């Protein structure tokens, strides 16, 4: 073989090695990307479940607070009506029976 052909063969060999390294790097990065995607897909359902659980807990607490507020408002309304009814009876000369201790 002549030196010229040897140089071309060597050049093609170097180019083939560079392409092989590039393909190897691409495969590694592709594998890494796929691993990251599957990791995030596995992690996301757990995060979603935690958020849903937190939302359920917050909703339960909000409902409990709303119930307490409504009960307090109803208690105030009954107390106000009781006072009004007692005042009307006092104006008529009548009264509630109250046991004194």
Swiss-Prot record:
Keyword Transmembrane: no
PANTHER family per record: C1ORF189, CILIA- AND FLAGELLA-ASSOCIATED PROTEIN 141
Quaternary structure note: Microtubule inner protein component of sperm flagellar doublet microtubules.
Function: Microtubule inner protein (MIP) part of the dynein-decorated doublet microtubules (DMTs) in cilia axoneme, which is required for motile cilia beating.
Species per Swiss-Prot/TrEMBL record: Bos taurus
Keyword check for NAD: no
A GO BP annotation: flagellated sperm motility
Residues in coiled coil: none
Intracellular or extracellular location(s): Cytoplasm, Cytoskeleton, Cilium axoneme; Cytoplasm, Cytoskeleton, Flagellum axoneme
Disulfide bonds: none
Expression tissues: Expressed in trachea multiciliated cells.
Name of encoding gene: CFAP141
Pfam families membership: CFAP141
A GO cellular component entry from the record: sperm flagellum
InterPro entries: CFAP141
Protein's recorded name: Cilia- and flagella-associated protein 141
Main location: cytoplasm
């Amino acid at each position: 073989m002549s030196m010229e052909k040897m140089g071309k063969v060597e050049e093609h060999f170097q180019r083939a090695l560079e392409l092989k390294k590039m393909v190897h790097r691409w495969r590694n990065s592709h594998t890494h990307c796929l691993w990251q995607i599957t990791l995030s897909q596995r992690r996301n359902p757990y995060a979603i479940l935690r958020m849903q659980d937190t939302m359920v807990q917050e909703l339960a607490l909000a409902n409990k607070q709303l119930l307490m507020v409504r009960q307090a408002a109803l208690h105030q309304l009954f107390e106000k009506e009781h006072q009004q009814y007692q005042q009307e009876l006092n104006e008529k000369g009548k009264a509630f029976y109250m046991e004194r201790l």
